[in-house]
Amino acid sequence: MAKSKDARVAVILECTSCIRNSVNKVLTGISRYITQKNRRNTPNRLELRKFCPYCYKHMIHGEIKK
């Protein structure tokens, strides 16, 4: 029998710096990325270092609830 495919889910990553420092910016907005994670291997929240076009640098993007 084949294994079920519900271990891999789509998650949304959001810039943690844009949420905290939304004041005094040239561009206003929040950077978001869509990726996948395996729930069996990473049961806790995912955090990746990605480029934020609003902060103009690489920042930590954390998983948010849908």
Swiss-Prot record:
PROSITE patterns: RIBOSOMAL_L33. The keyword Ribonucleoprotein applies. GO terms for biological process: translation. Gene3D superfamilies: Ribosomal protein L33. It comes from the Eukaryota. The keyword Ribonucleoprotein applies. This is Large ribosomal subunit protein bL33c.
